[in-house]
């Protein structure tokens, strides 16, 4: 099945992934590509529509991102957002001006609903603005289709060429008509069908993996988390016993997790599974290391080394499966965005790795991965398992990792997860865990002074891990968790709850 494709061209905006999610919510497949993508590559991909993202630059900046003018003559509908809107105008000989003050926040906008872009919408609504420059003169063949008090051209169109630009951000919730507008672009302008689904995605991946692998042997980096589990099942459905799953028990797992992983994949899925006990090896490499980036790199490299050693025992192995997903790629940096932190599935890979990668989920957000898992018949409990980073508890123990610190974190985390489950909050909270900051504090237990560790509890609500908010857990649940941890984990005398959203914080502490 040939899927309809929309290209999201990345100019470095903070909402790029959100644009992609909005497109996919309409059952339309999209890919994010850098603005440096050539016309030839775009033609080869044959998209049905193109969306330019926003970005931090001015079109007059010395190193401002550009596109070839020929792109606007391909006959492919284009929607420019914010910087993408200004770039379209600038490229087609319109004029972009820098005003005395910027326009930011919720803004009333006047819409021309005779335009296909604003079909069936109110004439006045609310949008979200975040710009300094604006279009002061539209290019030849264009007309203005939206205005605000501060922005004489809040949107423009060349309906004949199917070129559209909006100065506001339709992808964010604060633009009340944004989802409807994007839907109009996809279905009224691009004439798409919206027939992409998780079942069709799984079918396409299984077919592609069969063709790519042939009769070669494959190993899978299995952690037991949602991402690697779904990746393993997709590949197993494609090639069966040609796949061997290697589960590295690095001693950085949650309580009883190693045994649970082994049971699920051996008993329920009948997969070839090798469990490698490598705790001493990993802790030895991590000894004396406090920097979180170094910890991630060390763990990523050791993972690959273990796989290489196991592969040699198995014979001729050609491919390695990883559960990399879209947010992993974004957080590891692109041509137009800074690196937030290197991801264990991306930045930690050694350059001399001997395997070719299979990453069947690299185009999906977490909620889409779960949907694929359900399609594949993976048990609901496993599909909705808590997200868990590849480096495991090593990045939830701040500073140097030791067996003692791991044991403290593991027990506190188990109590937190148990009480969340008892309260019926498991599927209402995206992610929740305990971590061990490198902090000790004075306390009193009985009649004695204590000087013990602090445990930080982190719980967030999200749909894709790109943004998140701290979870409003009932006080009585937090109270019970706190009392249990300080009573059952003797090395702890203080519990704190993290009430920071993402951004500015990331979900994990390291």
Curated annotation (Swiss-Prot):
ATP binds at residues 223-229. The active site is at 82 (nucleophile), 169, 171. GO terms for molecular function: ATP binding; GMP synthase activity. It catalyses: XMP + L-glutamine + ATP + H2O = GMP + L-glutamate + AMP + diphosphate + 2 H(+). CDD domains: GATase1_GMP_Synthase, GMP_synthase_C. Homodimer. Pfam families: GATase, GMP_synt_C, NAD_synthase. Residues 5-195 form the Glutamine amidotransferase type-1 domain. Its EC number is 6.3.5.2. Catalyzes the synthesis of GMP from XMP. The keyword Nucleotide-binding applies. GO terms for cellular component: cytosol. It comes from Clostridium botulinum (strain Langeland / NCTC 10281 / Type F). The lineage of its organism: Bacteria, Bacillati, Bacillota, Clostridia, Eubacteriales. Keywords: ATP-binding, Glutamine amidotransferase, GMP biosynthesis, Ligase, Nucleotide-binding, Purine biosynthesis. This is GMP synthase [glutamine-hydrolyzing]. It comes from the Bacteria. Pathway: Purine metabolism; GMP biosynthesis; GMP from XMP (L-Gln route): step 1/1. The gene is guaA. It is an enzyme of class 6 (ligase). Residues 196-385 form the GMPS ATP-PPase domain.
């Amino acid at each position: 099945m040939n899927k309809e494709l929309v290209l999201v061209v990345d100019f470095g905006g903070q909402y790029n992934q959100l644009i992609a999610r909005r497109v996919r919510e309409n059952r339309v497949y999209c890919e994010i590509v850098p603005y440096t993508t050539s016309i030839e590559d775009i033609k080869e991909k044959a998209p049905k529509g193109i969306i330019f993202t926003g970005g931090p630059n001015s079109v007059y900046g010395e190193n401002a991102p550009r596109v070839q003018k020929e792109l606007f003559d391909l006959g492919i509908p284009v929607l420019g957002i914010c910087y993408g809107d200004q770039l379209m105008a600038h490229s087609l000989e319109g004029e972009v001006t820098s005003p005395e003050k910027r326009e930011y926040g919720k803004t009333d906008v006047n819409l021309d609903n005779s335009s296909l872009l604003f079909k069936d919408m109110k004439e006045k609504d609310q949008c979200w603005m975040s710009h300094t420059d604006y279009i002061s003169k539209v290019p030849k063949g264009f007309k203005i289709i939206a205005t605000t008090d501060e922005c004489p051209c809040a949107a423009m169109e060349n309906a004949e060429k199917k070129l559209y630009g909006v100065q506001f951000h339709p992808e964010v919730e604060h633009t009340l008509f944004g989802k409807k507008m994007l839907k109009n672009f996809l279905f009224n302008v691009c004439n798409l069908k919206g027939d992409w689904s998780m079942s069709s995605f799984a079918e396409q991946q299984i077919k592609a993996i069969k063709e790519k692998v042939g009769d070669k042997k494959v190993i899978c980096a299995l952690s037991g988390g949602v991402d690697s589990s779904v990746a393993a099942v997709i590949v197993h459905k494609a090639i069966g016993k040609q796949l061997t799953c290697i589960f590295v028990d690095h001693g950085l797992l949650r309580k009883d997790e190693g045994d649970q992983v082994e049971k699920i994949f051996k008993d329920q899925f009948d997969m070839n599974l090798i469990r490698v006990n490598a705790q001493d090896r990993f802790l030895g490499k991590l000894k004396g290391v406090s920097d979180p980036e170094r910890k991630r790199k060390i763990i990523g490299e050791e993972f690959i080394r273990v796989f290489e050693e196991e592969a040699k025992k198995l014979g001729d192995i050609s491919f390695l499966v990883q559960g990399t997903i879209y947010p992993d790629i974004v957080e590891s940096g692109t041509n137009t965005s800074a690196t937030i932190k290197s991801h264990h599935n991306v930045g930690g890979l050694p350059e001399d790795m001997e395997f070719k990668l299979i990453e069947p989920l690299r185009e999906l957000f977490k909620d889409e991965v779960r949907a694929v898992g359900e399609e594949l018949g993976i048990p609901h409990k496993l599909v909705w398992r808590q997200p868990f980073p590849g480096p495991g508890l090593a990045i939830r123990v701040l500073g140097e990792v030791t067996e003692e610190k791991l044991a403290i974190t593991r027990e506190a985390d188990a109590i937190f997860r148990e009480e969340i489950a008892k309260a019926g909050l498991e599927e209402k909270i995206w992610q929740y865990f305990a971590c061990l900051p490198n902090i000790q504090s004075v306390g009193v237990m009985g009649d004695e002074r204590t000087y013990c560790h602090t445990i930080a509890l982190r719980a967030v609500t999200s749909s894709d891990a790109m943004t998140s908010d701290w979870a409003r857990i009932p006080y009585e649940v937090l109270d019970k968790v706190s009392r249990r941890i300080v009573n059952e984990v003797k090395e702890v005398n203080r519990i704190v709850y993290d009430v920071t959203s993402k951004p500015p914080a990331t979900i994990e502490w390291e």
